[in-house]
Each structure stands twice: as structure tokens, then as C-alpha cells.
Amino acid sequence: IAALSLALFETGRFDALTAFFTMTIALLMQIISNMKNDLGYTEKKAETGNRRGLPRATTQGWISISAARRAILTLIVLALLNTAVLIWLGGWVFALIGISSVIAAYSYMGGPKPIAYTPFGETTVLVFFGLTAVCGSYYLQTFTVSANAVLLSISLGSIAAAVLAVNNWRDRVHDKSIGRQTLAVVLGDKTFTAVFRIMTALPLALGLVMAAAP
């Protein structure tokens, strides 16, 4: 929505159909990532008594593992169909963007080496929910990418990464006990806190830069 608003503000261009499919793919990526994260914890039996936070649907038995798998597969198919529309609207570059986004969303907690078990979770969020989502959305409306679009993508990506960072910091004791080497676990409290402060300050700083630009 922010990228679409910026495109309209800077160029006066807004295509409602393109905007619909842009927002739909973003929503699908988020749902796939969240559902696979929930399912992945249950499949790996990674839940222990010292974890904080909301209960997971598959762990609690609210959604069966088989139903969750079917739902994720259905969502992936919908995302790929949506990607086909984006390719038609914006060109073949969106084949790479769409497919890589689906893989990243699934791989966060799926596959032999889930991203969630590495220190690269925040970076992945910055790239796909920031740079890729914002610049891609802006490009679909304008067929170009402005400097402000890049700054906005970094700002929103940093905010999204900071949300994940808070979750990882909250769960650092639990994650360490099950072998998850998240950024919070690898850096330790002091360094991680400094990095988190940068994540939260950067959007404000870039916002001032955008506001001051002619």
C-alpha cells in the first residue's frame, strides 16, 4: 500500500487491477510463511515448555498437520498463479521475483536447513518484505524505480525485520535449547540490542531524508 501510494504521489499513476494482484501476492507470501512456520515447529517437535508467545495452531491440534500441508500447497499454487498475472503485467523479471519469494516464504521453516534456524531471518525479511515487495509494487505501477522507492523499501523492510528480531529475542533461550542459531542467539544480548536499535532508527532517519528531498 505504501509503495502504491508513493507511485501515485510521484507519478500520478495507479492501476487498480495491478494493485489488486500486487497486494494479493504480498498477502499470500505472508500467510505461507506464517503457516509453514507453525507447521515446521510441530513437524520438528521444536516446541518446549520454556517457549514464550502465542500457542501454535498445529501444536495445539487446532489444525491437523495434513490439513496444514494441504492449505500451504493450495496457497503456493495460488501464489504461482498470481505470479503468472504479474509476469503478464510487468514482464518476465517477475517470474524470478515471484518464484524466489515463494521459495523464501516456504524455506523460512521448511527444507533441510530452514532460514529460521540461521542468523539470516532478519536479512531475508528485509530483502523480500522490504526491497522486493516495495520496489516490485512501485515498478508494476510506473515501470521504473525511484530513489524514494528504494528508501521506502529499506524503511519498511527494517520495520518488518525489527518485528522478527523482537520475536527472536523473546525466544532466544528456547531457540538456543533446540539448536536454532538465530541472530539473537549468535550475537548475544548486548550486540543484538545495538543492531535492533539500528533497525528501529533507520526508518525514521530515511523518512527524514525522503521528507527533505526536493
Where are these regions (language model features)?
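Small-residue-rich segments of transmembrane alpha-helices in multi-pass membrane proteins
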Residues: I1-L4, T123-Y138, L156, A184-D189
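Hydrophobic residues within the alpha-helical transmembrane core of Major Facilitator Superfamily
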Residues: A2, A84, I103-Y106, G136, ...
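Alpha-helical transmembrane segments of multipass membrane proteins
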Residues: A3, I25, M29, S33, ...
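Short, hydrophobic transmembrane alpha-helix segments
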Residues: A3-T18, A212
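Membrane-embedded alpha-helical segments that form the functional core of polytopic membrane enzymes
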Residues: G12-K36, A95-A104, S146-V166
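Acidic (Asp/Glu-rich) catalytic motifs at the cytosolic membrane interface
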Residues: L28-R52, A162-A184
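Multi-pass membrane catalytic core of lipid/isoprenoid biosynthesis enzymes
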Residues: G49-L89, R180-P214
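Intramembrane alpha-helical segments
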Residues: R56-T144
